[in-house]
């Protein structure tokens, strides 16, 4: 008997033959994908694969065997900490926005009207990755993740034929190269033709393909790569970004051929040109990235929050569409805010199927006179949440009525009040409101907080409904319920064990993440980092926050003087710690964790020091001096106190210099600060 699919005679023992084929194919996969040393050519591999598939089709009882073919799955992806953070970019949408971006660079550097030179590159709509080479060999690849820590996808990246396995002898001993993994439109169409469940767009397809547990699946998806940025390196590579791209090309990396050097005045024409060519490209782009070309200027500009000061993404005009508003749902957030969300008849906007949009607040609904049943114009710009631009009154149903915003919480029924001067209405139910409890728990487990795998919205809601989760501390007692979790529908012992392991893996956390995870109003990721950097340890932070509850106390004044915090945020923090139930939560939670101290940048004279700048500096702008000090591990505050280590004085220093002298605080000249900061004489 001959197998019709493969043309190979039916073996006497199909099970034994299939086992042999599985073993040979697995060895070939491992050699090709992991060792970069193929042991058979493509034709031989394909013939064995076809024979194995034919045997499986003829013998359904053996169907599971071939599923093992491929390099051994990596299991859950490990975590990789980036030596230099992989940050996102700020966006601009109009020429005036770009002009202001350029002006902000000049202000920061004190450049006056000096012209700026950029490198412009199409912004690929894919998945950002970091490629690490040690001793000129590719050793590790990671996704961006939260910018600080990503997922280890090394074995999957090895399957990209465009990725150099080694670098030339002139490359540094250590270097991180950043780039974008994407899928061409052609390959996306081909992939979807063979998929039972289709991907919505090439970006989703690329992300899903790179995160396959089996590298063989990734290899079959035909992913592509563009390299475009630098991470950490043991030595400098080029003096300009344009030089760097040329070096990457010489090393064998694919670099976008549409990248160009442009002047400040040339940015707008280049933006128009790429926009006109966009539809004809075989890959999706959603704008153009403009980077300061001079790497020395990039170094001086540094970073602000989650984005570099030296680069910006100029996004293409927002995509728009018309659809029907089916309903307005009121969501209750972790701080009690009632937020309206539009429920829409699903519509494709820029390649993404949109079924919900933001309505911001009750004033916005009234201003736009948006009503249920209206035909509305929807806009989606880049990664921004879709929003309703306007309603079309001429298409409005005859029985339509204005939307009435609720004055009671839709979840717990408590009164929802709107404080004077605020646009948000808030539920007064506090911790008695199930929605607030659930949202706080979801926030606690989220990616930028404790990042607990498996503790998503659905799981949190289920466990809260069972009475297992009322506060974050309860998460770390779920080990006692492992058997009960395993018994739940859709779980089982393996899933329960993985969840408990994921929770245990997050018992150690940085101070900044811990502060953010608490969900204190107005304490986002950046403010949490500011607080962690300033107070260094959990014990000090908590003690100071409790003391800051007394208006006029040294602790309150110090908190309000932290650059970026200010009095209003200080009031929110003091209010949080004034609540007994919040202190009780911390008393339960903290003993179950290891909260890492914030480690100041090592080795410098400014590390861990508190600095105040006053007066006009000559060789540095105030923002540049502040950024330099913070990059070296210093804490910059606005007012002088006994805890201040240095006051840096410029011209017309005023009262702060006098107060420093009266308190015995060290006063530094600008030249002395430059020396401590490792800068050459100005």
Swiss-Prot record:
BP term (GO), one: DNA replication
CDD domains the record matches: BRCT_DNA_ligase_like (cd17748), LIGANc (cd00114)
Gene Ontology terms, MF aspect: DNA ligase (NAD+) activity; metal ion binding
Keyword Acetylation: no
Catalytic residues (UniProt): 123 (n6-amp-lysine intermediate)
Cofactor requirements of the protein: Mg(2+); Mn(2+)
Keyword DNA damage on entry: yes
Binding site for NAD(+): 42-46, 88-89, 121, 144, 180, 291, 315
Superkingdom of source: Bacteria
EC number of this enzyme: 6.5.1.2
Record's keyword terms, sorted: DNA damage, DNA repair, DNA replication, Ligase, Magnesium, Manganese, Metal-binding, NAD, Zinc
Cited Gene3D superfamilies: 5' to 3' exonuclease, C-terminal subdomain (1.10.150.20), 6.20.10.30, BRCT domain (3.40.50.10190), DNA ligase/mRNA capping enzyme (3.30.470.30), Helix hairpin bin (1.10.287.610), Nucleic acid-binding proteins (2.40.50.140)
Catalytic activity: NAD(+) + (deoxyribonucleotide)n-3'-hydroxyl + 5'-phospho-(deoxyribonucleotide)m = (deoxyribonucleotide)n+m + AMP + beta-nicotinamide D-nucleotide
Binding residues for Zn(2+): 409, 412, 427, 433
Pfam families per UniProt: BRCT, DNA_ligase_aden, DNA_ligase_OB, DNA_ligase_ZBD, HHH_2
Gene Ontology CC annotations of this record: cytosol
InterPro entries: BRCT_dom, BRCT_dom_sf, DisA/LigA_HHH, DNA_ligase, DNA_ligase_AS, DNAligase_adenylation, DNAligase_N, NA-bd_OB-fold
Enzyme class: ligase
Family: Belongs to the NAD-dependent DNA ligase family. LigA subfamily.
Task performed by this protein: DNA ligase that catalyzes the formation of phosphodiester linkages between 5'-phosphoryl and 3'-hydroxyl groups in double-stranded DNA using NAD as a coenzyme and as the energy source for the reaction. It is essential for DNA replication and repair of damaged DNA.
NCBIfam families: dnlj, PRK07956.1
Record-given protein name: DNA ligase
Source species: Acidiphilium cryptum (strain JF-5)
